[in-house]
From Swiss-Prot:
This is Protein NDRG4. Transmembrane segments: none annotated. Contributes to the maintenance of intracerebral BDNF levels within the normal range. May enhance growth factor-induced ERK1 and ERK2 phosphorylation. May attenuate growth factor-promoted ELK1 phosphorylation in a microtubule-dependent manner. Its main location: cytoplasm. Residues 352-405 are annotated as: Disordered.
Length: 405
């Protein structure tokens, strides 16, 4: 596995320390701990708790240059296949953010082909101890720089990242720093922009007039969802208050609201433009508070390897409210990269002539014109072939494929 062993200079003169295989091999890693039902009593009544069948999930606490990271993993590295690595939004943890999505039956059919690694931001996991007074929470850049330690610990050669909100920002930053370690990114509700003084002042004012859970809810859900006070909103209000340490959450929230611009530019728009190299699928609900931010992020990415998925009738948490549609989109995204070229959809098993929905067919075509065979998964995987590179005469793409479903 190739990891960067040299110093990496980030914005504003920030210098990250050496990150090397030899250095990381000297770190101490506690033994893995099975994730057993009943350990998190406050979560047992929630729909977001891991199902009883998921006894093969295991917890790890991993030492990194910027502190300990709590991760939950299922499976082992499979040949040359990347790991699926997730990063949750602020106010959540891997359970609250991803359980509905990863427990969805069709998603489980996909993930059995990969090792899955959920990363919890420092101090955000269920049952986390409160950080001592004066603790300096890692910056967003440092959160990204912690991930190579996770990859080294488990022997991951590369990852396909799935990030939501703040987690999408962290994974995008990771992909900019370590592009050779990333094969693909699914970025939900990403905001590529930093926070200015006006935003900072507004955030401070909001903190004075609203409780922390309410402030976080306004980040996660649209005003319409909050006004309707749906059962989903009520459930997350209770879970954010009871399952996430409020002091630790405040530190993460403050750091996210101090982030800098990702400083990406679409190739050809400025000299030496820097953007994400790997295939990217941007996802946002058409009623999400982050909709405009995701549209702006789309304008900064390479249109030849970017898919923009806007989910109709979806609010701020599409992975929770519409896991089926997102699973189908993710399946075709993987197929476009040359993975799981043949995967049976349980909903189509009753009819041999069933075909994917029109929107998902368009999504598949936008990612690739020819899929590799399933046997190529463990061998050398060819570079994804977009329509603009294919020889089927479909035509050349000069803009990002946008799909609504």
């Amino acid at each position: 596995m190739k990891l960067l062993g040299h110093k990496i200079e980030l914005w504003a003169g920030l210098l990250l320390p050496d990150v090397s295989i030899s250095g990381m091999s000297e770190l101490r890693f506690p033994e893995e701990k099975p994730l057993l039902r009943g350990q998190d009593t406050e979560m047992e009544s929630a729909d977001t708790f891991l199902s009883a069948a998921d006894t093969d999930w295991k917890e790890h606490d991993i030492e990194t240059p910027y502190g300990m990271l709590h991760v939950v993993i299922r499976g082992t590295p499979k040949g040359n296949r990347p790991a699926i690595l997730t990063y949750h939004d602020v106010g959540l943890n891997h359970k609250l953010c991803f359980n509905t999505f990863f427990n969805y039956e069709d998603m489980q059919e996909i993930t059995k082909h990969f090792v899955v690694c959920h990363v919890d931001a420092p101090g955000q996991q269920v049952g986390a101890s409160q950080f001592p007074q004066g603790y300096q929470y890692p910056t967003m850049e440092q959160l990204a720089a912690m991930l190579p330690s996770v990859m080294q610990h488990f022997g991951f050669q590369s990852i396909i990242g799935i990030g939501v909100g703040a987690g999408a920002y962290v994974l995008a930053k990771f992909a900019l720093i370590f592009p050779e370690l990333v094969e693909g990114m699914v970025l939900v509700n990403i905001d590529p922009n930093g926070k200015g003084w006006i935003d900072w002042a507004a955030s401070k004012l909001s903190g004075l007039t609203s409780s922390l859970p309410e402030t976080v809810l306004s980040h996660l859900f649209s005003q319409e969802e909050l006004m309707n006070n749906t059962e989903l909103v009520q459930n997350y209000r209770q879970q954010i208050s009871s399952c996430v340490n409020q002091s630790n959450l405040q530190l993460f929230w403050n750091m996210y609201n101090s982030r800098r611009d990702l400083e990406m530019s679409r190739p050809g728009t400025v000299p030496n433009a820097k953007t994400l190299r790997a295939p990217v699928m941007l996802v946002v609900g058409d009623n999400a508070p982050a909709e405009d931010c995701v549209v702006e992020c789309n304008s900064k990415l390479d249109p030849t390897n970017t898919t923009f998925l806007k989910m109709a009738d979806s609010g701020g948490l599409p992975q929770v409210t519409q896991p089926g549609k997102l699973t189908e989109a993710f399946k075709y995204f993987l197929q476009g990269m040359g993975y799981i070229a043949s995967l049976k959809d349980r909903r189509q098993s009753a009819s041999a002539g069933a075909v994917p929905s029109a929107s998902m067919t368009r999504l598949a075509r936008s990612r690739t014109a020819s899929l590799t065979s399933a046997s190529s998964v463990d061998g050398a995987r060819p570079r994804p072939c977009t329509q603009s590179e294919s020889s089927d005469g479909i035509g050349q793409i000069n803009h990002t494929m946008e799909v609504s479903c």
